[in-house]
């Protein structure tokens, strides 16, 4: 490939960055190896970048009359507004960054692209895989034509990413 590499947004933990709630990463060497020479990765961790720190308590998605909320599992504290403030700013940045695609971390309350487990208020019962991570949902709303996958789509999705 000559010239500039295409820009691909990616959940930072998939590149081995230790930004997850437990202080670890979820490195996906296959993604890196397949794409490293063809793309410029733009790593993003909504929870860390929104100031929630590392490590941080686990969170989950809850259904509420106000929509899907991101809740700290141990305390019930609602982190949705903090994340949404960051997401609003980040989506504007993504518009200027000209990314061609995004690779999300599956099942994450912020980055889950496919249905993420959704709970009733107070995590009393699972409503099943019905939700979508807040950041992933915002990206889909704002960039409906963009190719978006999660790490479970590899290696098949790599062919689409490097057309």
Q: Predicted regions span which residues?
A:
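Divalent-metal-activated hydrolytic enzyme cores
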Residues: 66-89, 93, 97, 124-163
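Short amphipathic alpha-helices and their capping/turn segments at secondary-structure boundaries
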Residues: 1-3, 30-40, 86-100
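Short catalytic/ligand-binding loop motif for oxyanion handling, primarily in non-cytosolic enzymes
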Residues: 18, 53, 110-114, 157-159
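N-terminal glycine-rich phosphate/adenylate-binding segment common to multiple enzyme folds
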Residues: 86-121
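Short beta-strand segments
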Residues: 11-12, 45, 103-107
